Curated annotation (Swiss-Prot):
Subcellular location: Cell inner membrane
Keyword DNA-binding (UniProt): no
Lineage: Bacteria, Pseudomonadati, Pseudomonadota, Gammaproteobacteria, Chromatiales
Gene name linked to the record: atpD
Catalytic class of the enzyme: translocase
The protein's name: ATP synthase subunit beta
């Protein structure tokens, strides 16, 4: 085990000098002897000096402090022992419940599965959320992005997905909190505890207040734990909240390492960093990883390089819209902007496909008529268009749904709607079977039968 000494500290970047014949390799983990702080090697500068990123606060570090090379990359505990626990980027527990007991530790830097190992699947994953199951269905082993600006409900949607999948499908999930609010992480833990699904979730947090090194690597820590479960032959869910902060941490590290910035100030290695992470999130012949990633959209601009780079890797994109949230419709999913590769009659069946396209057709027509309504009023529309508008407004309200995880705020019990009921309900609305009901009957209900029941009390 070679030993070196600190020669320079600039924020989270620490330069360490080693004897020339014992220079550590890129990604090796070094440990500052006095305080147990882990450093990860990023660059070899020559003359035995390596440039590292600190995986913790570098406050109080001094030059010439002794540093040891562990000779291996950062490794984290994997396996059953991680379930129900909150860990940091190094796999150390932060929930005050003793050490994480596992038989194995895996390096966080791993190669993506080869072509031969990968498998493509077409099986659908039912989420119980109407708008998602109908218009942007998830594939088992697919990647889903939840796009939205600040405060439109990315985290709440994600928590509902975890709750539904854990309760209804009883699968294992890994949640990586990357650069998000500590308060949300805390709420999330208690939410999981209260709904008795904590023993099926591993939680890995590197929150907003952590140094950039932690936020850059914590997604890899969570992914490594998910890969272990996948290689055991399980179907795992990997939740990342928020993938944008992973990019942002990369930008901070890149600037500290002195790289030249590219478009909008992002790191020049943006596409490569994103690809390294995303290519590992895949299904093999032994098991699958289905990932749901929240993507913060800076200033609601989807063409920003960070969300634009993420788009390329996803199978389904769920776009949350501020305009829909303003109408009080939650989940605020934009039904015309959200897409999925699975929305294909060969995968989901002809009936589901026709209903989904029918719903989008009605909403699209309503969008076109809005200008005419704004200028001339409803009375100038033809009878057919009036009917379209009335159905569109019903559909719009029917796309809302009370969430289990939001019961505390809304006072309404959550609803899980099966895919069969979802398709049947929307088909009935498009076919005009419920034209006689007032539109407010469709707001915040589960199935269309519940809407009919609600109408009796209006």
């Amino acid at each position: 085990m070679s030993a070196g000494k600190i020669v320079q500290v600039i924020g989270a970047v620490v330069d360490v000098e080693f004897p020339r014949d014992q220079v550590p390799q890129i990604y090796d983990a070094l440990v500052v002897d006095e305080r147990g702080l882990t450093l990860e090697v990023q660059q070899q500068l020559g003359d035995g000096v390596v440039r590292t990123i600190a995986m913790g606060s570098s406050d109080g570090l001094t030059r010439s402090e002794k540093v040891s090379n562990t000779g291996n990359p950062i490794s984290v505990p994997v396996g059953q022992g991680t379930l129900g626990r909150i860990m940091d980027v190094l796999g150390e527990p932060v929930d005050e419940a003793g050490e994480v007991k596992t038989d194995e530790r895996w390096s966080i830097h791993r190669n993506a599965p080869s072509y031969e190992e990968q498998s493509g699947g077409q099986e659908l994953l039912e989420t119980g959320i109407k708008v998602i199951d109908l218009l942007c269905p998830f594939a088992k082993g697919g990647k889903v992005g939840l796009f939205g600006g600040a405060g439109v409900g990315k985290t709440v949607n994600m928590m509902e997905l975890i709750r539904n999948i854990a309760v209804e499908h009883s699968g294992y999930s890994v949640f990586a909190g990357v650069g998000e609010r500590t308060r949300e992480g805390n709420d999330f833990y208690h939410e999981m505890k209260d709904s008795n699904v904590l023993d099926k979730v591993s939680l890995v947090y590197g929150q907003m207040n952590e140094p950039p090194g932690n936020r850059l690597r914590v997604a890899l820590t969570g992914l490594t734990m998910a890969e272990y479960f996948r290689d055991e032959g399980r179907d795992v869910l990997m939740f990342i909240d928020n993938i944008y902060r992973y990019t942002l941490a990369g930008q901070e590290v890149s600037a500290l390492l002195g790289r030249m910035p590219s478009a909008v100030g992002y790191q020049p290695t943006l596409a490569e960093e994103m690809g390294k992470l995303q290519e590992r999130i895949t299904s093999t012949k032994t098991g699958s990883i289905t990932s749901v990633q929240a993507v913060y959209v800076p200033a609601d601009d989807l063409t920003d390089p960070a969300p634009a780079t993420t788009f390329a890797h996803l199978d389904a994109t769920i776009v949350l819209s501020r305009q829909i949230a303003e109408l009080g419709i939650y989940p605020a999913v934009d039904p015309l902007d959200s897409t999925s590769r699975q929305l294909d009659p060969l995968v989901i069946g002809q009936e589901h496909y026709d209903v989904a396209r029918g719903v989008q057709g009605v909403l699209q027509r309503y969008k076109e008529l809005k200008d005419i309504i704004a200028i001339l009023g409803m009375d100038e529309l033809s009878e057919e268009d009036k009917l379209t508008v009335s159905r569109a407004r019903k559909i719009q309200r029917f796309l809302s749904q009370p969430f289990f995880v939001a019961e505390v705020f809304t006072g309404m019990p959550g609803k899980y709607v099966s895919l069969k009921d979802t398709v049947a309900s929307f088909k009935a609305i498009i076919d005009g079977e419920y034209d006689h009901l007032p539109e407010q009957a469709f707001y915040m209900v589960g199935t269309v039968e519940e809407a009919a029941e609600k109408a009796k009390n209006l």
